[in-house]
A protein has these predicted regions:
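Phosphate/nucleotide-binding beta-alpha loop and adjacent structural elements of enzyme active sites
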Residues: 1-240
């Protein structure tokens, strides 16, 4: 009776109370994958203010994290958050892609949706607060050009890619780095949310051809009205 009453109170506040299950916990599954593959270095591409790295640290991850972020405002917050762990390294402010030079990035009202690519109406309808409100010039480089600065031969590397439609370009600029990488977490879109982006079916084939296998799927972004899934994270690892 007491348990039911507590559940009702919690649900009235907009939350739910469930028994912890390591099989249904995203952080627990990621931690298990990291343990199996002995991951000790994570490339956090598209770090924003460090949300992913903070989540990893809260989940018990103890290895190195190397974060990359192009937006100046988000980068400043990222620097502050990184002081919470001595193994969290912040690269110079830059975007990661398949070229070296300068680009213009569009800044979203919700900065996590900012992108080099133009946003589609589908995205804006799905999340009205995501519309672009500004832009800034940024530096862009390839992982292949900078890997020796950050990576060691003994590293067991996992790369997380959250770049709002620019995922293929990141992989194309890391062709010589990818053979050293054990696993990938990458945001994949079911519909065109950014103009010119590659959709999930093309990305799945591309990543599998690189020698990875799909291990898990994490829902990421839904249309607020229809609840249709628009984006998910694919978790890939090389075969053991």
């Amino acid at each position: 009776m007491i348990k039911k009453t507590i559940k009702k109170i919690i649900r009235a506040l907009g939350f739910d109370l469930t028994r912890y299950n390591h099989n249904s916990s995203e952080s627990a599954r990621i931690s298990q994958f990291f343990s199996i593959y002995r991951i000790n270095t994570i490339l956090d591409v598209g770090a924003n203010t460090g949300q992913y790295a903070l989540w990893l640290l809260e989940s018990g991850y103890k290895g190195r994290i190397i974060s990359f972020e192009p937006l100046s405002k988000a980068y400043n917050h990222l620097i502050i958050n990184s002081k919470k762990d001595p193994n969290w390294i912040i690269a110079p402010r830059m975007a990661i892609g398949n070229e070296e030079g300068k680009k213009t990035i569009n800044i979203s009202g919700n900065s996590v949706f900012s992108s080099i690519l133009k946003m589609t109406e589908t995205h804006i309808k799905g999340a009205p607060d995501s519309a672009y409100i500004d832009s800034e010039e940024i530096y862009i480089n390839k992982l292949d050009n900078i890997r020796e600065t950050f990576l060691k031969n003994e590293d067991n590397i996992f790369i997380k890619i959250d770049v709002q439609g620019y995922e293929l370009e990141v992989l194309e600029g890391a062709i010589n780095t990818l053979p050293k990488i054990k696993g990938i977490q990458i945001e994949l879109s079911l519909v065109h949310l950014y103009e010119g982006q590659s959709l999930y079916h093309n990305m799945l084939g591309y990543i599998i051809n690189l020698g990875f296998e799909l291990y898990d799927i994490l829902p990421v972004f839904r249309d607020k009205k229809s609840r249709r899934l628009l984006q998910f994270d694919g978790i890939f690892f090389r075969s053991l």
